[in-house]
């Protein structure tokens, strides 16, 4: 297990569950309903001769053979009845009830004695659809790899039937063996592994000094990059509890695409500008809008498509000035666009190792808060995380049920009580807002502010 993945286990507590989640909403095929889906899943549970995907069959453990480091061990007695569960919404079965259930599920810890995931089939939606809520520990997968695993369980063909359950491998695989993957060759290979790692690091070390100097210089000039020194204190940057709130909403992706084209920006710039306007309105409504602009940490994926299907974490970060001190939506979008362009130019001049090192520099204060607790007198390194996880770009189905939407749930941490994550699916983009129930009151109002900000951006660019 990598040091980054281990950190997600070390930093976990009752107040800080460290799993990512997602809600997938499906429209059953004509003549079917959620009961038919439940029957399919029950059959897969009782006649499970296909096993589980390798990522879902491993559990975290430490032992003397790994010198106390976290590693992975295959669970040879995996109990699917524990991991796959059924839930039903109370009346009237609307989005408010669905988000409330997902928030409660997202606030509970995963059992570390088992593989670190759960899937919940949720029935009772009043429009006849059904939902699947899945949570997976961040040590197992980040948002990109989790989305890749979701895509592999679905089909382009609405008429395909007999598809495997979401937890099953897409193709037959040889049985796994119980080995600790901290060091495949065991403790005896650790000295040689250390020598190899040191040798490969020598070339990178010489490049870290100028990369560090450039990163510090950009931060001092308040330019985009992996580090910021100007994030203000806000109501989001307080100690958190373990209870969660969640809200979500979708918009046609074409609306964001047209705004981006008119403003010579990217869709992700528009996502950030929508978030900036919504945060400004929310903070102003709460009498808590700071004079300085909020800073968002924006994850940047460093993995390729093949890596994405094997779990794990591979991300760098950029710090983005959201321009929340500016009343004009067009000015906020221009601020975001400029800052992200500067940041991407900075990353383009670095190697992958340098990007990871500078990203660690920018994010390390938040990691320290996660491990040791939030210090209220320290300025936050950033105010919240806003991420955009690419999803499937075409209609996808599971045994004829169409995937209508994917809503991500992420991880608030101590000192960072709010997270905004969005993902695209076919022709829509969905925002998932996860927050500490105590730190972020009335979180659901942010979705209304997002909608109004998109309207304002369209007006600002002449649409």
Segments the model singles out, each with a brief description of its role:
Residues 1-4, 23-35, 39-416, 420-451, ...:
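Soluble acyl-CoA-dependent acyltransferase catalytic core bearing the H(X)4D motif
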Residues 14-20, 24:
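TRNA-binding/sensing appendages of the translation machinery
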